[in-house]
Swiss-Prot record:
GO terms for cellular component: Golgi membrane. The keyword Transmembrane applies. It holds the Pfam family Cg6151-P. GO terms for biological process: vesicle-mediated transport. Golgi membrane protein involved in vesicular trafficking. It is found in: Golgi apparatus membrane. Belongs to the TVP18 family. It is a multi-pass membrane protein. This is Golgi apparatus membrane protein TVP18. Glycans are attached at residue 24. It comes from the Eukaryota. The chain crosses the membrane at residues 25-45, 48-68, 100-116, 123-140. Keywords: Glycoprotein, Golgi apparatus, Membrane, Transmembrane, Transmembrane helix.
């Protein structure tokens, strides 16, 4: 019952396609948020080698990437041991308006880094702004808050998908 890389990528891209067909801005915001996680970690580390106060913004960017990871992938809260206070704080962002504010606050912090020096952290600020904008559009148009429907294990109707879901359920 080994999952092939091809079947995993096929399931991811079919789930991504299904998400975009729903035309819900909260799903778009979630995907932009997931991309911003990778950008935060990569560009935060890349900019940490500046010999100026940009180092502070780089460290903040890395921390933002880790917090956004927990906001966008809440199953990690069950796996990693966190205090109940921190877990409840992260769970506050389970609606469109709170996520909009969260992303726009993160964007504002990274936009301030331009005052020190123009670096590649501008890309992170842009992605945070776009994610915040997507969640704002979802809230303004009264779209319900949705989470991505990607299932790496396959469709629930297939035997492979049912076994994969059972394994994941037992782990969590």
């Amino acid at each position: 019952m080994a999952f092939s890389i091809q079947s995993i990528f096929s399931n991811i891209f079919s789930g991504l396609s299904a998400d975009f067909k729903k035309k819900n801005f909260s799903l778009y915001g979630q995907w932009v948020g997931i991309i911003s996680i990778l950008l935060c970690l990569a560009l935060g580390v890349a900019n940490i080698f500046h010999a100026s106060i940009v180092i502070v913004f780089s460290i903040i960017c890395i921390v933002q990437g880790l917090v956004v990871t927990l906001v966008e992938m809440p199953f990690l809260l069950k796996i990693c041991p966190f205090t109940e206070t921190f877990t409840n704080f992260i769970k506050n962002f389970d609606a469109n308006w709170p996520r909009c504010g969260f992303y726009l606050l993160n964007a504002a912090i990274q936009w301030v880094s331009i005052a020190v020096m123009a670096t590649s952290l501008i890309v992170v600020a842009c992605f945070f702004t776009v994610a915040g904008g997507c969640y704002a559009l979802a809230a303004i148009t009264h779209q319900e808050y949705l989470k991505s429907s990607i299932q790496v294990t396959g469709s629930p109707d297939s035997v492979e998908g049912q076994i994969g879901q059972h394994v994941v359920r037992n782990v969590l």
